[in-house]
Amino acid sequence: MFKDFFNRSKKKKYLTVQDSKQNDVPAGIMTKCPNCKKIMYTKELNENLNVCFNCDHHIALTAYKRIEAISDDGSFIEFDRGMTSANPLDFPGYEEKIEKDQQKTGLNEALVSGTAKLDGIQYGVAVMDARFRMGSMGSVVGEKICRIIDYCTEHRLPFILFSASGGARMQEGIISLMQMGKTSVSLKRHSDAGLLYISYITNPTTGGVSASFASVGDINLSEPKALIGFAGRRVIEQTINEKLPDDFQTAEFLLEHGQLDKVIHRKDMRETLSNILKIHQEVSN
């Protein structure tokens, strides 16, 4: 008993004082580059189109920021904003995951679509947002793409689609896979009408999206070092029993092997698209 008393008396007595510096920077003020880890002011980064000042890494843009960057002020008209996913297979927890992503992103689904003008030229646009279910393609994403393509076909508008996706949405099973064929049919009608489709592939674009509408543009563009592919690198290596090149499935690798027309730095994105639309308009007229 006395031994325990003396042992207790030897214990250090102290108070934990919280570091006041921990809360000096409000949330959202700073952003860390996922590539070089440099910390930058979010406002300045946004003004630079989310391109890192230090390593030139192209950090993901939200769907609305992307549209804002390539459209005249106030010209964007959104289509089908209220369309949301059901749970056709009664997949456990799917509704909760959708609701969580809706709250986190402010989006109803992984794609925003509509019409806009760029330097006065009207066009249809669809932009995938990888923050929502990793940009996976389900029934709503496929339906929204088809609706905007069909609108462009009817009104004879060029169409631009920005891909950013992990592939088909597993929670919707075969219904998600059906969107690959469904979107391709709409694009075929658009093409048969003699209209322009620009596929702009961003990081990452994989799975069923890379194997369908992302790869069949009249002009296929991409951003530097974007990951583009169908199956994962490890799966391919195990299947063919060979080591793949270090730059395999990058935009630069695909450009070198003829699968892309050009890799565009984000600062040149608006000007490049404007020039293409102007040329198409002149030829069409």
UniProtKB/Swiss-Prot annotation:
Cofactor note: Binds 1 zinc ion per subunit.
EC number(s) recorded for this UniProt protein: 2.1.3.15
A molecular function GO annotation: ATP binding
Residues bound to Zn(2+): 33, 36, 52, 55
Keyword Transferase applies: yes
Co-factor requirement: Zn(2+)
Annotated compartments: Cytoplasm
Zn-finger segments (C4-type): 33-55
Subunit note: Acetyl-CoA carboxylase is a heterohexamer composed of biotin carboxyl carrier protein (AccB), biotin carboxylase (AccC) and two subunits each of ACCase subunit alpha (AccA) and ACCase subunit beta (AccD).
Official protein name in the record: Acetyl-coenzyme A carboxylase carboxyl transferase subunit beta
Organism: Staphylococcus epidermidis (strain ATCC 35984 / DSM 28319 / BCRC 17069 / CCUG 31568 / BM 3577 / RP62A)
Taxon lineage: Bacteria, Bacillati, Bacillota, Bacilli, Bacillales
